[in-house]
Amino acid sequence: MTKTDAQGRHPQETATHAATTDEEVQDQWRAPFEVLSRTLVFQHEDHRLWWERAASKLATYLRLAKYSVGSQYQHLLMFYSVYAPNLGPWPNDKRDNVHWVCGICPGGENLEISMNYQQGAKCTVRIAAETITPAAGTDKDPFNLTAEKKMIEDLKALQPNLNFTWFNHFQREVLVPEEVALNNDEIISKVPFKNQRLHGLDLSEGAFMLKSYFMPAIRSAITGVENTQIMFESIRKLNLKNANFISALSTLEDWMVPTNGRFMEYWDGISYDAVDACKARIKIYTGIRMKSIEHARDVWTLGGRLQGEDIEKGFDLVARLWRRLMDEEPSTCEMKYWMQWVWELRTDVPFPVPKLYFSVAAAEDHYVSDTVVEILDYLGWDDLVQTHRALMDEAWSLGQTTKSYLAFSYISVTFHSIKGPYITTYGNPSGPRPVF
């Protein structure tokens, strides 16, 4: 007589039930990217390539940043539907199939993924991307507006509560209408980046925040009004009454306008993080070719206007990164001296908060990764050291390569009086393939 188990099942039934249970458990914990890749249908080959090669990295970022499984699915499906089919050709080895130059990455690429590390908080994953169509840059769509409009509409459909009050304000005050730009074709031809806006997303649990960047270069070229004047006037026209915000704005304007504020004018831009006047955060971007650590200190402090413990703590991090990424980093590429600077104007502090982006696209990835480990270790963020190392191995395969480039485009550093230091790494998913 055949024995049965406690539930009255025969041995073969028991084995089948156990195998089924194991499969169910395995399916429950299978990575969202793997599950979706088995199911999704792609519109064309480039859609598939952007999914397999870029979304796979985004999936690793989300998982290692400890986003919930539900949020991982949500953000991956957003990338699949809004971005992956509309990012244009996946770049070939020579990159000669890419016809549109974007201002997001140092090499003109149109997708960037970043990981923000900060004290006592979950990591934040961000993406910046410019969707394109075959007509971008041609007479039919010289400023790549068709793809941008579709992207905004798609994001609004996914998250209808997106607030465009300040979006419309800065569009009106910083940019020029398409018809005006078209009537000044000869002037516009001298501006290297033809897009007047770029967009990024801060990914959070169950939602995203749209971050739009408005570049005044085309308006400046047409009107003859300096970029800095355009940007500061656009902010003042918001009529914000917060005393801290007004103080910070005046301090930055006092330093930036007389010196023309920058030496690489096409990197100028303005963005905002919130539309609530009580929580307003506006950022002003510029590019400066740096000469020395003393030059960096002068810019960090706005010529001595910014002082205090928080400024000094922030510059200590700048100096440590400068030593590794500038003084000791062996590349001789001019690019590493081209640094992006950002000042954040907030309602909770009375001075502009500086942020420096080190340009590291020409540096070898293992070297940059080791530098990030050193600064995270110096800050005592042991758990984030492990997160970063896992990210480099799993998303960028640094553990299996001898050399690779463009796992990093930038490393940024800032120090907030309330939340402390922030370290952010920026990577280009469509960069050169690793050298094994």
Swiss-Prot record:
Subunit structure: Homodimer.
Family matches, as PANTHER family: INDOLE PRENYLTRANSFERASE TDIB-RELATED, PRENYLTRANSFERASE ASQH2-RELATED
One annotated GO biological process: fumigaclavine C biosynthetic process
Tagged with keyword Transferase: yes
Family statement: Belongs to the tryptophan dimethylallyltransferase family.
Function as written in the Swiss-Prot or TrEMBL entry: Fumigaclavine A dimethylallyltransferase; part of the gene cluster that mediates the biosynthesis of fumiclavanine C, a fungal ergot alkaloid. DmaW catalyzes the first step of ergot alkaloid biosynthesis by condensing dimethylallyl diphosphate (DMAP) and tryptophan to form 4-dimethylallyl-L-tryptophan. EasL also shows tryptophan aminopeptidase activity with preference for linear peptides containing a tryptophanyl moiety at the N-terminus.
UniProt gene name: easL
Protein name: Fumigaclavine A dimethylallyltransferase easL
Compositionally biased spans, kind Basic and acidic residues: 1-12
Biotechnology note: Ergot alkaloids are known for their toxic effects on humans who consume contaminated grains or livestock that graze on grasses harboring ergot alkaloid-producing fungi. Due to their strong affinity for monoamine neurotransmitter receptors they may also have clinical uses such as treatment of migraines, Parkinson's disease and cerebrovascular insufficiency.
InterPro entries to which the protein is assigned, alphabetical: Aro_prenylTrfase, Aro_prenylTrfase_DMATS, DMATS-type_fun
EC number: 2.5.1.100, 3.4.11.17
Binding site for dimethylallyl diphosphate: R126, K211, Y213, K283, Y285, Y357, Y422, Y426
Molecular function via GO: aminopeptidase activity; dimethylallyltranstransferase activity; peptidase activity; prenyltransferase activity; protein homodimerization activity; transferase activity, transferring alkyl or aryl (other than methyl) groups
Native species: Aspergillus fumigatus (strain ATCC MYA-4609 / CBS 101355 / FGSC A1100 / Af293)
Inducers of expression: The expression of the ergot alkaloid synthesis cluster which leads to the synthesis of fumigaclavines is positively regulated by the brlA and stuA transcription factors.
Reaction(s) catalysed by this chain's protein: fumigaclavine A + dimethylallyl diphosphate = fumigaclavine C + diphosphate; an N-terminal L-tryptophanyl-L-alpha-aminoacyl-[peptide] + H2O = an N-terminal L-alpha-aminoacyl-[peptide] + L-tryptophan
UniProt pathway: Alkaloid biosynthesis; ergot alkaloid biosynthesis
Residue ranges of the region described as Disordered: 1-24
Pfam (any one): Trp_DMAT
This protein's UniProt keywords: Alkaloid metabolism, Aminopeptidase, Hydrolase, Prenyltransferase, Protease, Transferase
